[in-house]
């Protein structure tokens, strides 16, 4: 009794025999017998359920039932008061429902429920189901027999023996329930684990509503095993006469009986249906309950009278027989249940009213009745052996027949022999049927009948040799207490009880064998799964090890390449530094040499210019002397002195102007020479830098090509390893799928074979049962005929011949009727066989179709999986190749970018230097011009002042001369009047000529100065145009080189536009050695420093007439001042195009 430990949390410590007094037997549930009992401490009436605890029994279902009852606290669920253990029996005290179950009511009264009664019962059951479903409980055995009524008309749900507990989000995968009320998704759990939930109870509710309306469930005329095959493939059942019912009732049943559980409504949703909302209260059921109680009371009284008569006739021997029969028939009305995964449920449907009239089934069993004929003797009844239970009932019937026919003639004796032979044949066929049933149930392993519970509740005097105190309170103790116990059992009920007892023993053995087989299969499957998992793990480990080794090798190669690259970078940077220092030294030496040469040339030119000036001065002095001589002759001494002074000033001014022009020319030549030297030096430096960059880029390209080759080789090796691993995994998966497919096909074939065998065995058992019934009817008819003959023989002894003739005629008639009945019976059997063969064929075809569909689906899944894996492998391989090409392309692009940026830097430095030179020139040239203008203004002002002074002196001299002449006139009025007038005229003429000469010389001086300034400006403009043209040519060459490199890259770039797996990645190109550290101003080497990875601001340089900017007319672009460079060089994939091209 080790399993009783599972019940300890729910079991009380009191003695149930002292707590309860049993009044009568009410019914039998899925686990035990239910009695009406009185709780002695309080005097309350309760329902006491007594269950026999066998050692072979599993207690999980008992624990589940008690746990659910203990949890539930609702008005529509049977209340639970407690549980106790006494010996090997469990006592469960629950609420007593005196109204009985709904099936008992409509079976006993032979009247189905009307629609208003059904609506009330439906509403109350829905309330109970709603509570259960909210607490995650599935009833799984909802039917009319499990819906109880109290005496006041309250509806209660009972019998949780096969219920299941759910988690919040889980579903069940067990095959439990009663076949006629079972949902399709629950039936499908026979072979495949199909999950189901609380919606299964809604289907059962719909079937119970049809049961209440029609007094039997749908498909009740079919055997329960056949129903299991037909429910999943048939349309949902409907009411037979739908015209007699309301639309709401029909619609409610349709919403319950949806084959798809997702379309089925919940209990809370169904409570809002108009069929339920418009119901009346429990007063609807009061009439039914009162009728049923009256019927039960009358039945109990009749049973008591029959017991008294039989007890007076039989005596002590019959009491002993009754006790033996109670032992054998204690489980006669147990429900046949379906068991899967160790749980039970009832199989057989309740009989219809017509069947109950003929057979007398489904009566309550508080009493066991035995009918015996008054003519049976005590010797024949006492001589019966109680070793085998099944032949016992048959032998009793034969003894009664022989006792009735004792005194007849020889013909009657022969007939009696025939009847005894038929009875023995029926007994043997019954034993055969039990054997066949055992074989059929051992083949399937899914269907059993739970009838072994009544052994402990049918009145054993002692259990396993224990004392009388340990036995449970039963009908015997009730009889001793003075309560009436009626015993009414027909011969058919006894035979059924015997069959159930035999079948229960067989079922237990079969269940044990099935469980052992299932355990073995599970162990084998677990071992196979473990082996497969081990193989998979080993493969995965090998693949991971290979992948890690390859990754390590590739990482080591990359590290070596990076180290070499760093070393090469360092060497290149050192070489570049050394080259730059050498270039700087050379440039400085060249500049110093050129400056010395220029200074020497300038000195020589100055000397030559001075010599020329001296010669010109000598010539002019000679000319002036000649002129002075002429003037001296004609003019007075003072004027000659003034003129000489004036000529000296003019000479000095001319000499200053010539010196200024010569100095300007020399300065401009110096500037031009310096500019040419600087441009040549820059050009040489740029050439050297471009050559170095070209050499560095070629080295880098070679290194990248080598890296790419190494990476491609690594990828190829990695992909070969991956292919091998994938092939191995595919082969493993194929073998596993083939193995699983073979196992499934074998399992399905075995299942088909077992199902066919079960079906054939059921057919044979049904045929045998029908034959037995037919033979029993024949024997009854024959008995009646013999009784009539006996009476006629007693009454008319003299008319033997007439009686013989009548007997022959009746015999012939009886043989004819027998032959016709046999023919009809054979035809019925043939029809039944044809129908069953058709059902079997359809079922086999459907199962074969399912097998084919499953095979096709598995093959499709395998093919799709292989295709997906191939596609993934191909895409990964192509993607890796494309990534390599893209990386190569990006690296090339980065190198080109670096080249372009370096060229830009060089060009920018050149432009900056040119702009600085032009600015210096611009600064120097206007300063010289302003100095010249100032000097010219000063000289002109001085000349004007001298002119004014000369004119004043001339005027003063003229006045003095006039005064002298007047004095002379006064002295000698008449001396030389003509000579004075002539002298005045000559003097005026000379003054005019001198002023004109001075003005002409000044005008010529201005013209010369303007011409020289214009020529200087024109030369500066030409020089600037040359510089700009050179710059534009350089830019044009750079742009053409860039375009060529772009075209080369485009021709070499991979075509990855259509690949959707490419992601946009940032280019990580290697940077060339930077030239920022050694770039300085013009005096040192090259100009301002720049960074290779950023956009630069370019400045424009131009000189106008008075310091303005000049826009070149060439097609090549001149970059404006303070403006970002418009080239972005973005490598956005998969387009592989520059965003902004020139």
UniProtKB/Swiss-Prot annotation:
Where does the record place the Protein kinase domain? 20-276
* Bias kind Low complexity: ranges: 371-390, 421-452, 541-554, 1068-1091
Catalytic activity, EC: 2.7.11.1
Give the compositionally biased regions (Acidic residues): 300-322
User: What ranges does the record list as Basic and acidic residues composition bias?
Assistant: 323-336, 467-477, 555-588, 597-635, 744-760, 939-969
Task: Give me the residues that bind ATP, please.
Answer: 26-34, 49
Top-level lineage group:
Eukaryota
Question: Under the cellular component aspect of Gene Ontology, which terms does the record hold?
Answer: cytoplasm
Active site located where?
Answer: 141
What cofactor(s) does the depicted protein rely on?
A: Mg(2+)
Q: What class of enzyme is it?
A: transferase
Q: Which reaction does it catalyse?
A: L-seryl-[protein] + ATP = O-phospho-L-seryl-[protein] + ADP + H(+); L-threonyl-[protein] + ATP = O-phospho-L-threonyl-[protein] + ADP + H(+)
Q: Which Gene3D superfamilies match?
A: Transferase(Phosphotransferase) domain 1
* GO terms of biological process kind: intracellular signal transduction
Q: Which PROSITE patterns match?
A: PROTEIN_KINASE_DOM, PROTEIN_KINASE_ST
Which parts of the chain are coiled coil? 716-1050
Region of interest (Disordered), ranges: 300-492, 515-636, 744-768, 939-974, 1040-1142
The alphabetical list of record keywords is: ATP-binding, Coiled coil, Kinase, Magnesium, Metal-binding, Nucleotide-binding, Serine/threonine-protein kinase, Transferase
Tell me which family the UniProt entry assigns to this protein: Belongs to the protein kinase superfamily. STE Ser/Thr protein kinase family. STE20 subfamily.
UniProt protein name: Serine/threonine-protein kinase dst2
Its source organism is Dictyostelium discoideum
Q: Which gene encodes it?
A: dst2
